[in-house]
Amino acid sequence: MKCWRLSAILFLGFMLTSLSTARFVVEKNSLSVTSPEKIKGKHDSAIGNFGIPQYGGSMAGNVVYPKDNSKGCKDFDSSFKSRPGALPTILLLDRGSCFFALKVWNAQKAGASAVLVADDIEEPLITMDTPEEDVSSAKYIENITIPSALIGKSFGEKLKDAISGGDMVNVNLDWREAVPHPDDRVEYELWTNSNDECGVKCDMLIEFLKDFKGAAQILEKGGYTQFTPHYITWYCPHAFTLSKQCKSQCINHGRYCAPDPEQDFNTGYDGKDVVVENLRQLCVFKVAKETEKSWVWWDYVTDFQIRCPMKEKKYNKECANSVIKSLGLDVEKIDKCMGDPNADTENSILKEEQDAQIGKGTRGDVTILPTLVVNNRQYRGKLEKGAVLKAICSGFEETTDPAVCLSNDVETNECLTNNGGCWQDKTANIAACKDTFRGRVCECPLVDGVQFKGDGYTTCEVSGHGRCKINNGGCWHDARNGHAFSACLDDGGVKCQCPAGFKGDGVKNCEDIDECKDKKACQCPECSCKNTWGSYNCSCSGDLLYIKDQDTCISKTASQAKSTWAAFWVVLIALAMIAGGGFLVYKYRIRQYMDSEIRAIMAQYMPLDSQEEGPNHVNHQRG
């Protein structure tokens, strides 16, 4: 036992050497004092690493400082549960004398909705964490559900002075900006461990992996998230690489190490066994990602914990390979990825893990196991499905939240009550309220390809082509006796105009015009007018026929006679045109013929201009 203690001290020294330059970033949330006026303003507070911070949300409450038990290290005699209609109670406690988690647990049991712990010294804010491997605290830590935060000493004194002076102190805790939310995809990473014999924290981690697997795979398969697993490793100082402690806890000649699972170098599994399995799980993720099925990692780690536990002496390569094969992964590829743990060379996979432990930008170094990082910000709070899902969902840009983030278990749908105070058309069942993880957004909707325009709160009007398909464009419409009329003009505008035969504003009403009464039609002496909805019927007396365009009545026989004479004249004109055309053709042909005959006769007696004059040869005969 003495030897083990010495070894543990040496290994702790190795860890401290590797973490001596670590940069731990305290994750904060905004705290605003809304009253009294004299201390009104914004302040920083450090999010506690237990309980359930309301990531993506906020809480307004009344601050109460107990006169007795001001440190909250024992049960409270009075209740801090708020009355119906009153603001939630936020209990202010002093630091010291007991664990932070115990203070919050006692406050939760007394009915407080949140806890502020005032520091007892002037120093930069720190993160309130859970006790390490404390069996008694494990009983209540996992049951803490309220959020908590540490505040500076001077700010705490101001709050206490205001309360003791009789002022009502109201504050607003805001976690909406605790996680960046730049776009529609969340990048998150989990720093975990394959060791299942490291106590309470390992048990909590195993349960979390099982519970969160389903949600994680839905998010990953849908392309909503990009998940990366990580594993913390340390190195053994070069001077101790040949020591028993380094040989049992490290691979690759002291380059990559993990603590002994049972904290006993002489029994059970060694730390190097944990490092090898951690490496295998990293390679499972790498190979699965290459096949575009990165979510299979969740299946492997949960199956391995069930099928290959240390307690049953199955924490080995053979059991791991059986799990890998059952998931359809290539064992040879994974073995090749792992490399040789006994070689005196660097392992590229584990070297990347050591480099990744060092914080970059706003993210601090990873020093707590397990650690969840969402959009490059370290998560603070209970490692529980609902709490972690809230943190991840708060990383999506508004209105891009996947369905899993909008379930009743994760958030409250503010659109269900009075439509969130947004515009709505109950008739068409259309509303501007959009439920998001951070709360409702009033935004005019897009329905069936038609965009509504407006402020989203009081007005949303359809516009553009196709608008008449949506609740008739907000215009008047009616149907009677099989006839339908609409005041909507589908010309890309927003105008409503009563159709022909109606008058009105086109929006709320269009009244039928009585053309007969108003003498707008059917006014000829022989006409008989009867009004109809949206039009009129006009008939003529006797055998007369009504011509609507001329608003007149004519005789059917006269009409027929006119039609006959019209046909006669059409035929006659056609014949005349044919005869005239024929005569012109005949005349043209005769003239051509006569011209040719006359020219032929004249050509016999005299030369014509069109003929070439030939040479005149005279023959002289000489005797």
From Swiss-Prot:
A motif (Tyrosine-based internalization motif) lies at residues 605-608. The chain crosses the membrane at residues 565-585. It is found in: Membrane; Golgi apparatus membrane; Cytoplasmic vesicle, Clathrin-coated vesicle membrane; Prevacuolar compartment membrane. The keyword Transcription regulation does not apply. Residues 586-623 are cytoplasmic. Residues 23-564 are lumenal. Its main location: membrane. GO terms for biological process: protein transport. Disulfide bonds join C415-C433, C422-C442, C444-C460, C468-C488, C475-C496, C498-C510, C540-C553. GO terms for cellular component: clathrin-coated vesicle membrane; Golgi membrane. It holds the Pfam family cEGF. CDD domains: EGF_CA, PA_VSR. The tyrosine-based internalization signal may be involved in trafficking at the TGN. Vacuolar-sorting receptor (VSR) involved in clathrin-coated vesicles sorting from Golgi apparatus to vacuoles. Seems to binds preferentially proteins containing a N-terminal NPIR motif. PANTHER family: PROTEASE-ASSOCIATED DOMAIN-CONTAINING PROTEIN, PROTEASE-ASSOCIATED DOMAIN-CONTAINING PROTEIN 1. Belongs to the VSR (BP-80) family. This is Vacuolar-sorting receptor 1. It comes from Pisum sativum (Garden pea). The gene is BP80.
